[in-house]
UniProtKB/Swiss-Prot annotation:
It comes from Kosmotoga olearia (strain ATCC BAA-1733 / DSM 21960 / TBF 19.5.1). GO terms for molecular function: rRNA binding; structural constituent of ribosome. InterPro entries: KOW, Rib_uL2_dom2, Ribosomal_uL24, Ribosomal_uL24_CS, Ribosomal_uL24_KOW, Translation_prot_SH3-like_sf. This is Large ribosomal subunit protein uL24. PROSITE patterns: RIBOSOMAL_L24 (PS01108). HAMAP family: Ribosomal_uL24_B.
Length: 107
């Protein structure tokens, strides 16, 4: 089953420790059913010094969260909503807000 959340979507966490937080999707992991959201679900990683990380040490970064725990925030009505798909008369597919019926973006 495909994910209805895409990279750069604004989403709101609807359950769990970070309930109510809003952030932008940095990456989707469709095989795992997870997404990585900016500013949500930080974990600490022990990083060995390498060329990329000169100092190393303990680094905080975002960890994946299940996609079923987030909802897309509609850019038109600014409410968390389910996402539907619709085919326009021109033949192109678009994502649609289930609350206000407005087009979110192209698929």
């Amino acid at each position: 089953m495909g994910m209805r959340i895409k990279k750069d979507d604004t989403v709101k966490v609807i359950s769990g420790e970070y309930k109510g937080k809003i952030g932008k999707v940095l990456k989707t992991l469709p095989k795992e059913g997870k997404v990585i959201i900016e500013g949500v679900n930080f974990t600490k990683r022990h990083q060995r010094p390498t060329n990329q990380y000169r100092e190393g040490g303990i680094i905080e970064r975002e960890a994946p969260i299940y996609a079923c725990k987030v909802m897309v925030v509609c850019p038109n009505c600014d409410k968390p909503t389910r996402v539907g798909h619709k085919k326009l008369e021109s033949g192109e597919k678009v994502r649609v807000c289930k609350k206000c019926g407005e087009i979110i973006d192209k698929v």
